[in-house]
């Protein structure tokens, strides 16, 4: 147990710059490039492509700044990170023969950088929770919101990023249909907020290690199995039925109404039989 505790302490002291930040930028820019029409936008308007990639890379910081009434442009003040992310953007989109993109698209390398990006997610959530606490003492909801925004800001502002590329898909709003990264970031924000308020009987560095190991394990498993379904789905479905009920779809309501109407309505054969019996009674 002591060795595990020492490991978690050393892990919590890891520096994200430059290697983990680089992995985050590479994965984010590659994700931006793989969106529909992204290469066409890069050829026609490099500035729009660059801005879209920066939203993927720094969306969490921008969104959390807006929520805390801080200048969102402050993200640009970190010249080193902006230059690093911009260099990676250029190499992902414009490197000759796509050698840079294809190198990191190679599955073993992509698994490594994807795992490193999940490590940065933990640090971003924790920094958001801590930053919110410095503004609003013990405001749990605010701390959860800012931690969530900083850890999953790129997904939460995806509609705005789509507008930069000239695309409008309101049905893809993360609040309507949350993706796995947004869900797991929300869970992480809740956990780190409860730990920060001493509501969880676990140290911060142990929680950081356990949560990060969970993130990396699930991410690698999903990539190896090519799964896009949320791992939380087996829990979400029964919980939704228990807590919020299971409402019938409009099509099911119409079908049930038509079937009940058909059951209550006599058939044509029955009507003909009844009318024949009534005519016989009249003749007699």
Swiss-Prot record:
Organism of this sequence: Xenopus laevis
Swiss-Prot/TrEMBL catalytic activity: K(+)(in) = K(+)(out)
TM stretches of this protein: 16-33, 47-68, 80-99, 103-121, 138-155, 178-195, 207-224
One term under GO cellular component: endoplasmic reticulum membrane
Region (Disordered), start-end ranges: 246-284
Protein name stated in the entry: Trimeric intracellular cation channel type B-A
Residues making up the signal peptide according to the UniProt record: none
Main location (coarse class): endoplasmic reticulum
Lumenal face of the membrane: 1-15, 69-79, 122-137, 196-206
Cytoplasmic side: 34-46, 100-102, 156-177, 225-284
Binding residue positions for a 1,2-diacyl-sn-glycero-3-phospho-(1D-myo-inositol-4,5-bisphosphate): 117, 121
Localization (cell): Endoplasmic reticulum membrane
Family to which the UniProt record says this protein belongs: Belongs to the TMEM38 family.
